[in-house]
Regions:
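Positively charged, proline/Ser/Thr-rich regional signature most characteristic
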Residues: 1-36, 105-168
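Thiolate-centered catalytic microenvironments shared by cysteine-dependent enzyme domains
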Residues: 16-110, 127, 168-169
Length: 169
């Protein structure tokens, strides 16, 4: 279990948002404490359509580590489940700075870079906002809800289907 608030994000702030990227040293320490090392291959899953596990995989990959999502997440796992907590010994995970090329900021969004809003369409349109203090979206952003990347059973669409979906972008 990799906690969002302790490992995958820094504390919320008005300037950086609800789940800002974690400090790279704190991220490395959190993973090392969980027994995830520099050379480990991580397969992540969640029960949220891949949103949380996807964040872990993205963070690991932009740091050059080997990581993948379990397609379909927990709901497609066909084996038995357990309630036992697996503990791994502390590992070595060297802190690495976040690569600038993998990140955008407000100035990037304001200067015409393509911005995709992956939230639900009703949140994008400002019709419903159950989480954030303001409804709506970044001016100029396009709505491509992450749920559109998945089939009815929660698995990712084929690469061809995803290419077609994003061809208009």
């Amino acid at each position: 279990f990799v906690p969002m608030d302790d490992v995958l994000a820094d504390p919320p702030s008005k300037a950086r948002g609800r789940h800002p990227l974690p400090d790279h040293d704190a991220f490395a320490e959190g993973l090392a404490h969980l027994g995830i090392g520099d050379t480990d291959t991580v397969v992540a899953y969640d029960d949220a359509g891949g949103a949380m596990a996807g964040r872990l995989v993205w963070l690991l990959r932009i740091l050059g580590r080997d990581a993948a999502l379990l397609d379909g997440g927990l709901q497609t796992w066909e084996g038995e489940l357990t309630t036992e907590v697996t503990r791994r010994p502390r590992a070595e995970f060297a802190p690495t700075s976040w690569p600038d090329a993998a990140l955008a900021d407000i100035e990037d969004a304001a200067t015409g870079e393509l911005v995709i809003d992956a939230r639900g369409a009703e949140r994008f349109r400002g019709e419903s906002e159950p989480i954030d203090p303001k409804a709506g979206h970044v001016p100029g952003a396009r709505s491509y809800p992450m749920t559109g990347n998945l089939t009815e059973d929660g698995r990712f669409r084929t690469p061809e289907e995803l290419r077609e979906r994003f061809a208009a972008v």
